[in-house]
């Protein structure tokens, strides 16, 4: 049988009719699902830009001598500069900033105005708490099938300082570790964390950041995280751990003091249990749960923490 060739019926008339004059290129429009962006911390916070912090927010002062504090924008910029200097040659991304606990005020000229008559220019704001994450995506590794990028995290909370005194060294928290790109969970190790960083100027803050980066051993941190995947627990053991975590708050004070502090709240513990069943990446309902997945269930629940306690709960001891 001869090969059958089907020719367009109008092929011979194509040149004469010049349909191209009337035809347009087809445009295929595809509806792509919009996925909400993951953040390293989510609940109780809102996104903020560096421009907003610099130009729309006032800077708190120490009330007894009217000395300026190091504001959130200066904190972010200083650590960003330190990261770009230390990791020269790597791609250092701009900070992802989250803030909470807005403090509102008004300018002196608007003191006697009713609240419903205030103009935007009459109002002042600043945020009591701020946190940021700076990723270095060119430094990465895979652990448990998850890509981890090097990440620097800073936390500042004015509520942990006495602003009614004279100027004293100011408290900051700074960490360097890895961010799980699957869920943006932060993985922090003790060697990469300064929980009581007190400085009086941005130059001191800059030097402290460089010192932290220099002392951090990413290879050791990655090795410890990789080892988590070598140990597993049964569903029964997981249920026992969750149950004992819930019992902790009910223990007499003497019993609690003899145990390591339970920093997770009951709500967060419930989130861990729910994620064990439903989480697509780290859930293991009906099967064994390795420690890497368990760790990510815990850090995932931690994303609902308040900013001032966030880094403490992300820590691997």
Language-model features, listed with the residues they occupy:
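Histidine (H) residue identity feature
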Residues: 39, 51-55, 72, 101, ...
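A generic structural signal for well-ordered alpha-helical segments enriched in polar/charged residues
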Residues: 81, 85, 251-254
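A short acidic/basic microdomain associated with nuclease active sites
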Residues: 85-124, 129-131
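Feature for intrinsically disordered/low-complexity regulatory segments and propeptides
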Residues: 1-80, 87, 91, 98
């Amino acid at each position: 049988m001869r090969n059958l060739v089907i020719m367009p019926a109008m092929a011979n008339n194509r040149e004469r009719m010049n349909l191209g004059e009337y035809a347009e290129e087809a445009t295929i429009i595809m509806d792509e699902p919009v996925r909400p962006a993951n953040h390293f911390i989510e609940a109780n916070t809102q996104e903020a830009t560096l421009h907003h912090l610099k130009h729309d927010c006032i800077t708190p002062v120490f009330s007894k001598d009217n000395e300026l504090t190091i504001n959130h924008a200066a904190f972010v910029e200083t650590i960003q500069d330190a990261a770009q200097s230390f990791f020269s040659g790597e791609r250092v991304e701009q900070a992802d900033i989250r803030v909470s606990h807005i403090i509102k005020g008004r300018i002196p000229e608007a003191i006697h105005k009713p609240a419903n008559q205030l103009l935007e220019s009459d109002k002042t704001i600043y945020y009591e708490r701020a946190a940021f994450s700076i990723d270095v995506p060119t430094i990465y590794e895979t652990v448990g099938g998850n890509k981890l990028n090097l990440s620097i995290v800073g936390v500042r909370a004015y509520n942990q300082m006495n602003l009614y005194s004279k100027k004293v060294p100011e408290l900051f928290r700074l960490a360097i570790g890895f961010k799980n790109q699957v869920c943006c969970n932060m993985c922090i190790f003790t060697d990469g964390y300064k929980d009581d960083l007190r400085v009086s100027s941005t130059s001191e803050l800059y030097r402290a950041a460089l010192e932290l980066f220099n002392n951090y051993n990413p290879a050791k941190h990655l090795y410890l995280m990789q080892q988590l995947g070598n140990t597993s627990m049964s569903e029964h053991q997981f249920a026992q751990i969750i149950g004992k975590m819930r019992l902790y708050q009910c223990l007499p004070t003497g019993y609690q003091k003899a145990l390591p502090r339970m920093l997770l709240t009951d709500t967060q513990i419930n989130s861990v249990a729910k994620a064990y069943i439903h989480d697509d990446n780290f859930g293991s309902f009906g099967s064994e749960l390795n420690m890497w997945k368990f760790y990510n269930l815990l850090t995932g629940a931690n994303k609902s923490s308040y900013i001032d306690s966030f880094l403490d709960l992300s820590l691997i001891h």
